[in-house]
């Protein structure tokens, strides 16, 4: 049993909670969020994407009870003040989006946790892990503050790995056609990113993504070879990564699709899914995969290749958090 604390009970924190319910190895021992417990309980029970939880959810001033299990809830601004030692927390999921620097996330360890998993790209972390791609690099003796990368990197990395392992990537560009997130606004409103200052539900909004450059953290051989941007679109979840690369040698559509299918049924099973169906974004909502490779969209001209992978940027990513915490927890 792995005792887990959650810091930040927003979209990812709650998605992770739901996903963890199917993993008997994970035991949630505490939640920290500045939001009133009544609101936290309501948003856990009712979700616009995932639907009703289907379990009884109640709350008190200092706890939330789900299906008869009571979980302590705190409202601490400083992670150093959280009682992780008292709760015997093995791992803390840092999902506020605010404590992505190692020095800040490390406060959970000072408070008694053994490991911290950051649900975002991080700074000065001990290691960034994409499950299925570089998880075997994890060293429990030296890696204590761990980033799960971004949802987009989790989608991009499996596809890039297959291409690079089989043909070699010379260089490439990617675009993530990405659902809007809480960093955007419903109506035009000031934002440091002037494009994100525009209404999310009625615009296609180009913005930055660190996914292409972050790929080097999990596949060092691709450092400096990929770049790209995000195009935020008016849907609440369900995204796609469009990757165009120059390969070191020529490949055919059939060869690329065969390699992706083999990986999906082999080394990347559970992370990479292969489909031949003509799907749209709604079809992959609540899919737990990191990447659903769309074989019908593979295009090739000589050694230039375009491929597409879908991903549920909330649910798929949250399932990887469950996998990573389970993987790390087994070494404690």
Regions inferred by a protein language model and the residue ranges of each:
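A generic structural signal for well-ordered coil/turn residues at beta-strand boundaries
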Residues: 60, 125, 200, 237-239, ...
């Amino acid at each position: 049993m792995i005792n887990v604390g959650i810091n930040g009970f927003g979209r990812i924190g709650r998605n992770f909670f739901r996903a963890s319910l199917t993993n008997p190895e994970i035991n949630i021992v505490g939640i920290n969020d500045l939001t009133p417990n009544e609101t936290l309980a309501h948003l856990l029970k009712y979700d616009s994407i995932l639907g009703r939880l289907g379990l009884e959810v109640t709350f008190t001033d200092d706890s939330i009870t789900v299906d008869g299990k009571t979980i302590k809830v705190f409202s601490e601004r400083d992670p150093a003040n959280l009682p992780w030692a008292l709760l015997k927390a093995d791992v803390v999921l840092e999902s506020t989006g605010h404590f992505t620097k190692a020095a800040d996330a490390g406060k959970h360890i000072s408070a008694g946790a053994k490991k911290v998993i950051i649900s975002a790209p991080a700074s000065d972390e001990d290691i960034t892990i994409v499950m299925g791609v570089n998880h075997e690099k994890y060293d429990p003796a030296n890696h204590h503050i761990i980033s799960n990368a971004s949802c987009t990197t989790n989608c991009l990395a499996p596809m890039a790995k297959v291409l690079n392992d089989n043909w070699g990537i010379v260089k490439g560009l990617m675009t993530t056609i990405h659902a809007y997130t809480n960093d955007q606004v419903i109506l035009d409103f000031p934002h440091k990113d002037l494009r994100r200052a525009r209404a999310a539900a009625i615009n296609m909004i180009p913005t930055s993504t660190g996914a292409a450059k972050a790929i080097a953290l999990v596949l060092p051989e691709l450092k400096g070879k990929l770049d790209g941007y995000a195009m935020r679109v008016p849907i609440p979840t369900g995204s796609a990564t469009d990757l165009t690369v120059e390969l070191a040698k020529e490949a055919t559509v059939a060869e690329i699709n065969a390699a992706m299918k083999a990986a999906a049924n082999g080394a990347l099973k559970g992370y990479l899914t292969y489909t031949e169906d003509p799907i749209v974004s709604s079809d992959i909502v609540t899919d737990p995969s990191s990447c659903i490779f769309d074989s019908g969209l593979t295009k090739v001209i000589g050694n230039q290749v375009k491929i597409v992978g879908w991903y549920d940027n909330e649910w798929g990513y949250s399932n990887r958090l469950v996998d990573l915490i389970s993987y790390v927890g087994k070494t404690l």
